[in-house]
Amino acid sequence: MFSLMTAWAQVLMASGLFYFIQLPGARSEENCVNTEHCLTTDWVHLWYIWLLVVVGALLLLCGLTSVCFRCCLSRPENGEDGAPPPYEVTVIAFDHDSTLQSTITSLQSVFGPAARRILAVAHAHSSLGQLPSSVDTLPGYEEALRMSRFTVARCGQKVPDLPSVPEEKQLPPTGKESPGTEPPSH
């Protein structure tokens, strides 16, 4: 494709120069009958003007070629783009169970069952140890990576399945059943 575009640009350049040369020449003559074709400058003898035109055309051709070359290189090859997009991780801290329940209820319509699982895991880890009241900031990125409670996946890696946590089983059902009724046994 690159050589085809280069050839096409060269053909356009050559045809443009050919038509420009074919323009009727105007000469500076003292006895000019038709003043429309009479000019005071003889363009053929002004070689520096032609040099500027050719240099400008070559710069234009080089610019067009480099843009096409960059476009061809920036396209991903077939099979390279098959990797899944990078994962995003959101950590949410909760102080009370009522906050957890209201957050699960509001986020479940957006994220579905994944919201319950993520929030249940976050709640299980937050109950392991309470933060001192004097500490208002979250740990830094490097410190969070060193904690053994989290599983970190690099971009492009598949995240391993997490084991179920007890809090996930304690959450109320999301169906239309009321919490006090049990499903009928068969």
Swiss-Prot record:
Gene: Tmem52b
Keyword Ligase listed: no
Residue span of region Disordered: 158-186
Location(s), subcellular: Membrane
UniProt keyword Cell membrane, yes or no: no
Pfam families documented for this protein: TMEM52
Chief location: membrane
Keyword terms, alphabetized: Membrane, Signal, Transmembrane, Transmembrane helix
Membrane topology category: Single-pass type I membrane protein
Transmembrane regions: 44-64
GO cellular component, one term: membrane
Protein's recorded name: Transmembrane protein 52B
Signal peptide: 1-28
